[in-house]
């Protein structure tokens, strides 16, 4: 048997030479510098046993990285940095052929000539500006990544050939180039200052960017909106136009929300009875095929959530579309579903009444009123219930809601949209710009209008551009003022920078300029401040934090409106009438959280009325599975599943350790330590008081805490009503504890069926 010293290795150029164990030792020792509880010899031992004669130098490096990553544990969390440094070393060798990165200008020129980068970067910036930025870039920041972060960067974000897996750049170039692209149209006198500040904010993880921006800005493909909302009308032309729009956007990195709630029910009359309608299911299948026709720009698989009202005449057949029973003909399992509910339907449930199902085309005005005017909806609904000439199905509300919650529990991916909250506590005036749907991950609430053809100028496709503040990286809430200004400027510039494959999306985006800025690392933020999800101790801090965030973002958008003018559809917002989120939130929250307001909302109100806003919306709290890993942060507003979680994605199994594990391990509250959903839902309600769009809020159930190890229907319905009571607009995943070890609990797909509208 060969001893490691006898082995020959295959160099990159194909030559064979004796293995240099000293060199390996030097690299591992360098990577271990300053880290605690890591053993160089253990990494070497673990990797040596996997070496073989003729092994390629690349494979040696990969083996050592993997050996270090396998040692990551609660007792030895620093191996995540040792493995990351080795991976960065390897990455630079692959991208540049050596450890030292090239000059920024040389790098950009080389990749532009190769067709990987957009030519405008070389055209817009002078050689002197390149020199100044090259001197500013801090490549040492690559050393602060965790292993999970480097693997996510390699898999999803760094510009590469996705077929051969050849990577062409390293993280600091990614960050500075995103900044250069977004601020390229700013005046020469100020733009380098913005580029540097934005580079600092993103490369030190204070601001987190979504996948489409990280992987796409600087390349020739210019579509970076994370979420696309497409509404379909009750006509074949519109169904075809919707299908084309889905294909166009799925191929360009976007996740889709489809509103199909207007489509008439099975056996409705077509052309006055000349034909019978085949119902929704054949058309939903068509949408599923369109969604799955492309992967999102090679970065992730296509994904969509489809919306319909709970009172649709086919509701009973639609609620079961995702489950594992039934046959192919009556199941559409590759879409997620958003079921739309309002006050009247909940009232019928509470009072033990019935729900009447209708086909939307047979009840004039009802579908529009469902979103725009709750009193009018109630008047029409009861009127149509009493009309003997209208086709209907009557079901006990308890039965329909039980089916809904059973399917939500069984699949985890039947989502809830409270459409009244989405319109009464909204930046948009529902009389002129009602919100009819949400998006893939349930955090977007923007107006849409159906298309009759793909070039329909009267249709409206809503796009939302996302990013997030890292709460854990803030020193104080006033820091949000500068970060809000930078982020709003960058994302607003992005709207003009990107291309629009469908005209209905361009006109809508140019008119509304909607942004969705959220947060990551909330669980760490709570732990660091010594408060918890479950006991009410975090309510005050959460109120202060989200107040500051919404206040400073609105302020940034007013300042931008002073410079560039308000968005052209500002008159369709309630902001133009002087209304603010602090006026329209659900007052039931006051009994839960009595924290006063700390900012000068009245002078902000006056400024908004006077100057307008550059952006109709500013906030949305999205899931952030991937970009949280980059920042080594906890996911969005979620409690972690364990202090060390194992995540499986197509780039392999990754271990992630919560921030400041050593000092805060007893301060964290993990998902399955929460006694129930109530504490979490109250916090979501407090966030929703300020957040102008919606929140990807999840519910979680541990069957072990229930009689007979079965989650009770009563508890699920109680949580649904609690969420409604506190003004929560949407509910996303339903998580069930499956009894696996907590460190393994996160092995699933990338969530969001491919992660499109998360960051």
Identify the meaning behind each predicted range:
Residues 1-5, 38-176, 180, 193-199:
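Core nucleic-acid recognition elements
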Residues 46-47, 65-67, 82-89, 201, ...:
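A glycine-rich phosphate-binding loop feature that marks nucleotide/adenosyl-phosphate handling sites
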